[in-house]
């Protein structure tokens, strides 16, 4: 009896856990993305991404370590983590970095961080072609971070 109860409770817990991560599409089919392993949005009013038809939109990603939800140390490491965060979200919806059609990069110091952004992006993408990219210097980013990158991917649901 105890074993049956444990199995039943375990299955119920698994179903609840699955439901917590399932995202219902909007009336027009937009599905929000909050994949396992991504940074936590907590109880805030945003998702890390959304799929709308064949396009995947990833929210501005910072160099936050998903395991701790804290900014990683070091400029290059933080920029790399921002790219890795957007990569994870895109991959959760079936895209690769090569499917990126738009990058918008915000940095707190253009002269200091633009070369690092280019270096890390080249390492992660490998070789051209690279997606269109616009980089802005901004006065301040959330948590006084140095970089935030938002992105759009094209990944047809039917190939």
Where are these regions (language model features)?
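N-terminal presequence-like segments and the immediate start of the first folded domain
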Residues: 2-84, 88-93, 98-101, 107-159
